């Protein structure tokens, strides 16, 4: 065989290994995610730039490639383009005053053409506060909704889930809660995840119309935005909340909703060829929500005393709370409000199913007077639901059972509440006092709503009610003068219905 001299030197090409540690190239593009070679020093959640102008974040690391999610939706990225890691992890820009801001995942202002520059930034992903820095939940966060504040109260620093079918009133509860924080020294953050742009604009307009944007921030991504932006949005909202919490402020953050967040994450992981699990969600679906919601805490005084109260929302299908994502978030949070479509369609708004709803720690933060007036309300409603089924079949009930039915029917009517009409603490006390002391016993259920409206009108007209409202935070029980005032108001309001 003829000898062949093979000179490998002529094929030698210089490879800059140092360059490949911080740089790479686009090898593949797939529906908003890219696969890059190189980037040996890359870290999870590190910010990158593609071709020096497109923003991305590292979401996947393996031996073959680095998976990058594109923050901006674009068709301008091509295979072979350069990819470079930055010197920071993904973060959201902050402004000196966050009230009234509408921002995207990275803190870029939306619907605002001003050239104001950010003054700081906050990382989207960080560790949960150490347990020694956390305090107990002892202060109430009033929603202004009678059924919630009395039966399933929420405390500052709590995580309370709202779940229910589409069009069952989840967002309306959140909006009412934000509006009720007026003059309560609570900064509100509404996080819209993958919603229609028109729907987001409608919520913002409602908040602005009621003056709530004066103490609120909106972090939003629309359904038309990239999957990565939708996935990162709740973390951006939490990063803003943490920056405010570190200033000693109380923050309320609404996630609308985490079902769409889980869907966006599922799509991203499937694009990265991760093995699907239950309902095709990846195995770390629990982690993405627990790592987010566990950042909502009440800090102790040594660490500023600020708090983050988180109200995530989950959309159910056919009132099924046993699906994968609902059960995950139920186990992460400190309680849940289950909104039932059947109640909503019957006109019971807010449509809270008291039998399934619970607040595990909110009772410790409830106002002591409301706690005392609310102690047996859950039992009354539960008995009413049981006995009502017997009445539907025409069964005769004894006097004791009929009283339970009457009380339950009255309480159900009292808990009906028009949208955008939150109740103050003293208004709720007045309503509950009227119920608990038998002033509604002989009233027709059809008159309860009219009576409630007149009751609140008479309360605000009473000369001592304003003083009672101003002192309510310092009052732990009703004295004789308070009782006399409440009974005068209730008797005057009840005269037209006697």
From Swiss-Prot:
Main location: membrane
Superkingdom of the organism of origin: Bacteria
Membrane topology of this protein: Peripheral membrane protein
S-S bonds: none
Subcellular location: Cell membrane
Entries under CDD domains matching the protein: ATP-synt_F1_alpha_C, ATP-synt_F1_alpha_N, F1-ATPase_alpha_CD
GO cellular component, one term: proton-transporting ATP synthase complex
E.C. number(s) listed in UniProt: 7.1.2.2
Gene3D superfamilies for this protein: 2.40.30.20, ATP synthase alpha/beta chain, C-terminal domain, P-loop containing nucleotide triphosphate hydrolases
PROSITE patterns xrefs: ATPASE_ALPHA_BETA
Site (Required for activity): 357
Chemical reaction(s) catalysed: ATP + H2O + 4 H(+)(in) = ADP + phosphate + 5 H(+)(out)
Ion transport in keyword set: yes
Keywords, sorted A to Z: ATP synthesis, ATP-binding, Cell membrane, CF(1), Hydrogen ion transport, Ion transport, Membrane, Nucleotide-binding, Translocase, Transport
Job of this protein: Produces ATP from ADP in the presence of a proton gradient across the membrane. The alpha chain is a regulatory subunit.
Subunit structure: F-type ATPases have 2 components, CF(1) - the catalytic core - and CF(0) - the membrane proton channel. CF(1) has five subunits: alpha(3), beta(3), gamma(1), delta(1), epsilon(1). CF(0) has three main subunits: a(1), b(2) and c(9-12). The alpha and beta chains form an alternating ring which encloses part of the gamma chain. CF(1) is attached to CF(0) by a central stalk formed by the gamma and epsilon chains, while a peripheral stalk is formed by the delta and b chains.
Family membership noted in the UniProt record: Belongs to the ATPase alpha/beta chains family.
Name of the protein in its database record: ATP synthase subunit alpha 1
UniProt organism field: Listeria innocua serovar 6a (strain ATCC BAA-680 / CLIP 11262)
């Amino acid at each position: 065989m003829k000898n062949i001299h093979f000179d490998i030197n002529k094929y030698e090409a210089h490879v800059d290994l140092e360059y490949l540690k911080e740089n790479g190239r686009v090898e593949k593009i797939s529906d908003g995610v890219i696969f890059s070679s190189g980037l040996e020093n890359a870290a999870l959640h590190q910010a990158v730039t593609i071709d020096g102008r497109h923003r991305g974040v590292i979401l996947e690391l393996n031996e073959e490639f680095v998976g990058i999610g594109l923050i901006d939706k674009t068709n301008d990225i091509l295979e072979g383009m350069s990819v470079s890691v930055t010197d920071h992890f993904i973060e959201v820009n902050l402004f000196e005053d966050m009230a009234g801001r509408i921002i995207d995942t990275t803190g870029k202002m939306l619907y605002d053409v001003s050239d104001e520059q950010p003054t700081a930034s906050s990382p989207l992903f960080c560790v949960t506060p150490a347990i020694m820095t956390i305090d107990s939940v002892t202060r109430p966060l009033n929603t202004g909704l009678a059924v919630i504040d009395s039966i399933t109260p929420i405390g500052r620093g709590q995580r309370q889930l709202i779940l229910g079918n589409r069009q069952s009133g989840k967002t309306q509860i959140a909006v009412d809660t934000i509006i009720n924080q007026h003059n309560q020294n609570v900064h509100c953050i509404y996080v819209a995840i993958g919603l229609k742009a028109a729907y987001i604009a409608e919520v913002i307009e409602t908040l602005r119309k009621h003056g709530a944007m004066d103490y609120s921030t909106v972090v939003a991504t629309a359904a038309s935005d990239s999957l990565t932006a939708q996935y990162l949005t709740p973390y951006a909202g939490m990063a803003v909340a943490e920056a405010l919490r570190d200033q000693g402020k109380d923050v309320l953050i609404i996630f609308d909703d985490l079902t769409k967040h889980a869907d966006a994450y599922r799509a991203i992981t499937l694009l990265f060829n991760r093995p699907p699990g239950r309902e095709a969600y990846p195995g770390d679906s629990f982690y993405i929500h627990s790592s987010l919601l566990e950042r909502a805490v009440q800090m102790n005084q040594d660490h500023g005393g600020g708090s983050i109260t988180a109200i995530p929302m989950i959309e159910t299908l056919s009132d099924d709370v046993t699906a994968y994502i609902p059960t995950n978030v139920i186990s992460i949070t400190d309680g849940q409000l289950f909104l039932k479509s059947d109640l909503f369609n019957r006109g019971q708004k807010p449509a809270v199913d008291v039998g399934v709803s619970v607040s595990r720690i909110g009772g410790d933060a409830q106002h002591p007077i409301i706690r005392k007036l609310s102690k047996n309300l859950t039992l009354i409603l539960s008995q009413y639901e049981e006995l009502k089924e017997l009445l539907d079949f025409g069964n005769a009930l004894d006097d004791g059972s009929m009283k339970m039915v009457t009380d339950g029917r009255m309480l159900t009517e009292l808990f009906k509440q028009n949208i955008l009409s939150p109740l103050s603490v003293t208004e709720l006390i007045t309503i509950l006092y009227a119920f608990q002391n038998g002033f509604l016993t002989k009233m027709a259920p059809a008159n309860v709503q009219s009576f409630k409206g007149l009751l609140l009108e008479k309360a605000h007209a009473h000369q001592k009610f304003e003083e009672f409202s101003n002192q309510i935070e310092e009052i732990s029980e009703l004295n004789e003068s308070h009782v006399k005032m409440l009974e005068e108001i209730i008797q005057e309001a009840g005269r037209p219905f006697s």
